[in-house]
Amino acid sequence: RRQRQMCIRDRSQAEHDRLASPVLVTDSAALAKAVQAELEVQIPQLPRAAIARASVDDNGKIILCTDLHKAIEACNIIAPEHLEVCVEDPFGVLNEIKNAGSIFLGRNVPEALGDYFAGPNHTLPTSGTARFSSPLGVDDFVKKSSFLYYTREALGEVAPRIADFAEREGLHAHAKSVTIRYEK
């Protein structure tokens, strides 16, 4: 039953398009083997079997890790758009997960639940960009400004370095904008 569930998870990624990257990361050799066999049974049953087959053949991976923590490290490197954490205690490993667009915790949270019903949104970083990007959120619609304040003394301490940086870049007016404040 578990390999069928895991296989369906991979299929649901594979049927998106030929460029999809269905990946299973596990620390169980038995599960990896069972999912591989189950994919061969289930893919032909899909209406979009040709797309799913191409996706699995060209971009699909089953990554076998020595332990759960290595599996999480692999997931952080992959930085998937969707990450289904199907372990006994998903909340126990949540703090280790740093790079995923949307994280589905537990065996009762299929991707379709997040896509169509309960997810916070479906605009997620793809192609590993979850390493440096976040899902679309409220912060994307809030205008912000940054603020900077230095005292005359604090600026004086760093002014020579700033001027040096600016001159090395060939931006002499930038350098002068700092040094002019200290001319007599």
Regions found by a protein language model. Name each.
Residues 16, 24-100:
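A glycine- and small/hydrophobic-rich beta-loop-beta segment
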Residues 11-17:
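Active-site donor-nucleotide binding/catalytic segment of nucleotide-sugar enzymes
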Residues 23, 27, 31, 63, ...:
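Catalytic cores of large soluble enzymes that bind and process phosphate-bearing ligands
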Residues 1-8:
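Short, small-residue-biased leader/transition segments that mark boundaries at the very start
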Residues 77-184:
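C-terminal core of ALDH-fold dehydrogenases
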Residues 9, 34-38, 116-118:
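Short acidic, glycine/serine/threonine-rich loops at helix termini
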Residues 1, 19-21:
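Structured catalytic cores of enzymes that bind and process phosphorylated ligands/cofactors
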